[in-house]
Amino acid sequence: MNRCNIRLRLAGMTTWVASIALLAAALSGCGAGQISQTANQKPAVNGNRLTINNVLLRDIRIQAVQTSDFIQPGKAVDLVLVAVNQSPDVSDRLVGITSDIGSVTVAGDARLPASGMLFVGTPDGQIVAPGPLPSNQAAKATVNLTKPIANGLTYNFTFKFEKAGQGSVMVPISAGLATPHE
């Protein structure tokens, strides 16, 4: 082999290696700056969510069965949610809930311990409210409707806590339990 032939082979090899490196860099950089599909997933629950300072409200929903076009005024429906206190040392208390669709009555122990949870209402299909066995005391929130409501729509609710303050969120009607197919 002569020197010319060796130089051509080296040049061809260098070009080939450089093009492979460029291709690898281009392929690995294609996803740069993009948000992955799993980065912002929301929980698969019926209700909405709200954060008021250190208090997180999760799976907020109206629990009612709609048998006609609307759930009529005068009927009482339950409001179900889970409140989580992220403060490690400050307890809080649910002072009240207001809504445009009716008056909301909160009964039971509405205290929210530091780093603890408060269950409001009993979800469909459960006999007792979820929570630790020694202190299985959930509060109950009942909405006495003054306006008709319907599935598929959301309704404004304002939650007021003693220390965290207040916040508003649009709340849906729960889809409820599915009836078994026969």
UniProtKB/Swiss-Prot annotation:
This protein's GO CC annotations: extracellular region; peptidoglycan-based cell wall; plasma membrane
Membrane topology value: Lipid-anchor
Positions of S-diacylglycerol cysteine lipidation: C30
Annotated signal sequence range: 1-29
Recorded coiled-coil stretches: none
Lipid-binding residues (covalent, N-palmitoyl cysteine): C30
Cellular compartment(s): Cell membrane
Main location: membrane
Annotated keywords: Cell membrane, Lipoprotein, Membrane, Palmitate, Signal
Entry protein name: Putative lipoprotein LpqE
Native organism taxonomy: Bacteria, Bacillati, Actinomycetota, Actinomycetes, Mycobacteriales
